[in-house]
């Protein structure tokens, strides 16, 4: 639930319209790293190592290796997949 909340701040809900699907596969677009942080200054349970080490990328051609799709991200009018490991 906490991971989902963090992605709602940075990612748009998945929408499968024809226009958005076409913009996902633009040749020459580079993957973009996204830093995701959890926790508060007082050190609550959100400081768990598994959450602190979450690394996400906005990818145009799908997730790689051990990454999972966790939503979408946008740059301008282009839609990318939010892939995290």
From Swiss-Prot:
Q: In which tissues is it expressed?
A: Paneth cells of the small bowel.
- Residues making up the propeptide: 12-50
Protein name, entry field:
Alpha-defensin 11
Write out the annotated subcellular location. Answer: Secreted
Positions of region (Disordered): 14-46
The family database entries (SUPFAM superfamilies) matched by this protein are listed as: Defensin-like
Gene Ontology CC terms: extracellular space
Organism (species): Mus musculus
């Amino acid at each position: 639930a906490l991971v989902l909340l963090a992605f709602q701040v940075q990612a748009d809900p998945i929408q499968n319209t024809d226009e958005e699907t076409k913009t996902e596969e633009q040749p020459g677009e580079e993957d973009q790293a996204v830093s995701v942080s959890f926790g508060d200054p007082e050190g609550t349970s959100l400081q768990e190592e598994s959450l602190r080490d979450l690394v996400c990328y906005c990818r145009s051609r799908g997730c790689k290796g051990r990454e999972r799709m966790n939503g979408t991200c946008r740059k301008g009018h282009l839609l990318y997949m939010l892939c995290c490991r």
